[in-house]
Amino acid sequence: MDQNNENKKIMPLRYNEKTWLSGRIAETTGGFASHRGAQAYCLHFRGDGSAVWTVEAARQETFDLKLAYFAGKAAARVTLRLGSQTVCQVFPPVNGYASQQIPMRDPAMMQNPEDCESVEVVDTLTIPEGIREIHLQVETRGEFRVFYLELIPRSAKAAIEEKEAEAARLRPSIFALAQKGYGLFIHWTARTKPRYGEMLPYEEAVNAFDAERFARQAEEMGAQYVIFTTNHGSEAFPAPLTAWNKYHPGKITARDLPADLITALEKRGIQLFLYLHIPHMAGFPSDYGTSFNFTNTAMRDTAAQSEICGRICEMLEEIGLRYGEKLAGYWLDCWQPMVLKYGTDPTEQVYKAAKAGNSRRLTSFAFGVRCPTCTPWQDYACGETRVIGMLPKEGRYAGGQSKGYPYHSILVLDDDWWHDFYDNPIADPQYSADQLSDYIRGCMKNGGLVTVNTAVYQDGTVSPKTMDVMKLTKKRVYA
């Protein structure tokens, strides 16, 4: 490699699959362009600015293009330039889920959703062999973010489209579950705080967790299913898994809490999904900034990507075979670094491993609150929407982050996902039972799935105020 290029991030182009150029690997070259904070994986513009991606082409190829972006209150004019080739297009604000949101009462508590989308670019780029630069110029009067530029090789386009059609054919339908009612998302982890006093050590908390009481509580709240976190913010898993212990020694428990939850919930007709945090499961940094703070050598190390996916598959297969058909689904968090760091999508392998023991197990890969989904290999949208917003259209998202995917939205009812404060009560519900029930009924009518995230204390109990709202919601939804 040329010495002048050794400090750049240079993405090798693929010719039998898509290549993703994340905003993170672009070099900012002028104006109001930056990488910042929780959005470190994208390019952030607060006015006109420019950047450049560097790619390595093994041969000349023509690529179709898609740009994943967010536009604030004004459209942006985007120009892509490669040598003498120029592609110009205006990208307007996206009209998706967030355009009809009921904002959080306290925006500082967490991020309100924003509408981002992956949109086809009107023209192509022909990239000659060698190290090449794709220049990006953004003209905007407001805020504009570029998450990634997607390159689809013309020579393999038909095969890529057939693979995406296969992924769609393999999806189990969520319609029956959506028609039954809503679910609960419960962030109970090694970080969840008690109402009073100090936390129990993790394994003690697992042993003390009352699965029967938890299941009764879920039933009283009207849940048809529960998404239960296992390792959010932690490498611990609440069961004696051999593969997990292999990669995270000592981070398992003697008690099999998911098995006990399945038994208690099943008696009440409630299904169990498991949440898994991919960064901690895979053993790479969990926060976006650190996950994307990589070298050119690391970015090009697809062998490392394969090794990580192999570990994930091994753990998923053990979990899936252990719980079989009684484990209804997965919600796999923070998947975007696996695609956007390496520029290639390994999701198919992991998706198929997630079906071990239950070919109908519903599986979703989360790309964060503000990044368009870039894999066809999932059964339902992760739906990290947080607030009430646009209803589904024929069971799918009509626009925005998850456009075209089976509709699933998660509402954060009280605390910011989990209860993280000592000697403090869980926050009051931000939505009334009327607001919740109207939205849930609207989604059920249109084939969409809704999950309500309610914080719990370390003993697994919700706040009395949250329980009151959910009991009334249950009464109105199922009347």
Please name every model-derived segment.
Residues 2-59, 66-479:
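Mature catalytic domains of secreted/periplasmic carbohydrate-active enzymes
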